[in-house]
UniProtKB/Swiss-Prot annotation:
Belongs to the UPF0102 family. This is UPF0102 protein BQ09720. GO terms for molecular function: nucleic acid binding. It comes from the Bacteria. Gene3D superfamilies: 3.40.1350.10. It comes from Bartonella quintana (strain Toulouse). It holds the Pfam family UPF0102.
Length: 122
């Protein structure tokens, strides 16, 4: 039962990430990475448009408030650490503007994109 619930949650997350990636493509962003994993943490989506880089956390929840509350300070730190690793691999990193966004996937609604959902302490 627990394994089934975990698998269902995983697949719901994958579908949400695909929907969020589609939404960003619709806004003319290039999807640079999906599910970028490091030993420090994972980034759901990394998108680029010119020098703007979006580090995106995707949450599938019933309400926008639930999606926003699902991102803890610890999650933010892990995302920042993973973003540092990704950025270190970019040749043009000195030119990049980085933003940490949230995309909430809600039932029967278009994705809710929250730009600059949190800022880096660095």
């Amino acid at each position: 039962m627990k394994k089934e619930r975990r698998q269902k949650s995983f697949h719901r997350g994958v579908r949400a990430e695909k929907w969020a990636a589609w939404w960003l493509r619709f806004k003319w962003f290039h999807i640079a990475e999906i599910r970028f994993k490091t030993k420090c943490g994972e980034i759901d989506l990394i998108a680029r448009r010119g020098n703007l880089v979006l580090i995106v956390e995707v949450k599938a929840r019933s309400t926008l408030a639930e999606a926003m509350a699902a991102v803890s300070r610890m999650n933010e730190r892990r995302i920042e650490a993973a973003a540092d690793i990704w950025l270190a691999r970019q040749k043009d990193r000195a030119l990049l503007d980085v933003r940490f966004d949230l995309i909430a996937i809600l039932p029967w609604r278009l994705p809710q994109h929250i730009p600059a959902f949190f800022t880096s302490d660095k």
